[in-house]
Amino acid sequence: MNRNIFRAANVVGGGTGLSRLLGLVREILMAWMFGTSLAKSAFDVAFLIPNLFRRLFGEGALSAAFVPVFTETLEHDGLDGANRLAGKIGTLLATILFLSVCVGYVVMVFVQNTFEIGEKATAVLSLLRVMLPYLFFICLVALSMGMLNSLRHFAIPALTPVLLNVVWISALIWICPHLGDTLEQKIQGVAMAVLFAGGVQLLVQLPVLLKKGLRPTFSFDWQDSRVRRVLLMMGPAALGMGIFQINVVIDKILAFYVGDWAPAALNYAERLIYLPLGLVATALGTVLLPTFSSYAARNEPHLIRETLGSALRYVLFIMVPATVGLIVLAQPIVDLIYHLPGKRFDALSTLQ
């Protein structure tokens, strides 16, 4: 594998690794404070909605479509052309997200005033009301991260997710214990921390964008051929990712029918799976997308083939043993990480 790619993957992997490590600390604290309670399960279900938009309009489908076109524009038209494209896409994305948040609040008010909803739905909606604007921030963060990655600036985008975990952990330690005696009151502090972290993540990106010469401005010229290309390329990716993410949402909702504990238990297990995935596959994919886009813009398909082959061998070398280890050692790993004696995550939670 190209040394520059490997070095960049290590930078992204290091930032992702730190984020995943802090994310694991965050989940340990969540298990310590909330266990597999209804409050924790309601939070996990409510947090799915901003994450769904992040996957579709942020680091998922939009980034997969935007980064290649943005990289090509950089190669051919320089920063001026890239700024114009980023301004048009950013304006379109911000408009969609703002309208989505408004519609979301209208739907929540309609549901609560029209239907008789139970304790679980009430708990989910109370948290979603707080966290819904997070999708606006995090999708714009993902767009700015895509621009920086296209300029081969990987450090700040890789470290930006760390801020979410830092704010989240800080809230668990210093804010949530003082919000009341019930878990429902304490979990509201986590929801507010998530929203605050989204704003912080966006603000951190701005100075780096300006330093790199990226100064996109609002533009409603969405008839641009490159904007249309981004949207056309986004369609298949959004369809594929959308189906997967909707399945994730359905999984968590169906888990509620198993028991109040089930969505929380499912989320704790997913955190362990995503740890090696984020360290290797996600980090490498983040670096490879702008690299492949640059090769394609320069009409160098042989470099794409060589790099892809090396990347696949590297991923398999790491992920196959990690997968086997998680399967064979599932119970002792969960028990070691999450089971803190005397708190809400007990032996039954481990089995769940």
Region spans (language model):
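Membrane-embedded alpha-helical bundles of multi-pass transporters/translocases
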Residues: 1-352
